[in-house]
């Protein structure tokens, strides 16, 4: 590649890097639902977010990478079973659960009490 072409593409690459870094992730739970999710820690390998689920709140559409969820208190809520029925989900304080990457939201929480969860996302 001629030197003048390399020099002319460098500003475009720098501009793309700056603009790309400034664009927020559209489905980042911390960005779309700061009243539910709070960032506790982040580096290049993991991100730790704290989730507070309250009865009657509707989670907006958001996405997670693979993660481990640690329940900071006992939690119970009803979930749709996909066949027109519901089943109760129960988690004990300190219980750790693997959750694969997913995009979800748009459902209203039906919890017995406020539920706090620490989510350790693998980046």
Whereabouts are the PLM-identified features?
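Short acidic-glycine-tyrosine-enriched beta hairpin
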Residues: 84-101
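Ligand-binding loop in jelly-roll beta-barrel domains
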Residues: 74, 101-123
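Glycine- and acidic-residue-biased ligand/ion/polar-headgroup-sensing regions
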Residues: 64-83
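Bacterial Sec-dependent signal peptides at the C-terminal "C-region" and cleavage site
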Residues: 14-28
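A short glycine-rich, His/Asp/Glu-containing loop-to-beta-strand
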Residues: 33-58, 65-69, 120
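Bacterial N-terminal signal peptides that target proteins for export
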Residues: 1-11
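Short beta-strand segments in beta-sandwich/barrel cores
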Residues: 58-59, 75-79, 96
């Amino acid at each position: 590649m001629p030197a003048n072409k390399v020099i002319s593409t460098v500003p475009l690459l720098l501009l793309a890097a700056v603009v790309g870094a400034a664009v927020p992730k559209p489905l980042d739970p911390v960005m779309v639902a700061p009243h539910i999710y709070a960032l506790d820690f982040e580096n290049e390998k993991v991100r730790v977010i704290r989730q507070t689920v309250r009865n009657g709140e509707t989670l907006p559409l958001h996405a997670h990478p693979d993660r481990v969820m640690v329940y900071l208190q006992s939690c119970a809520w009803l979930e749709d079973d996909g066949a027109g029925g519901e089943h109760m989900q129960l988690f004990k304080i300190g219980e750790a659960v693997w959750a694969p990457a997913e995009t979800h939201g748009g459902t209203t929480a039906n919890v017995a009490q406020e539920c706090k969860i620490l989510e350790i996302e693998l980046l």
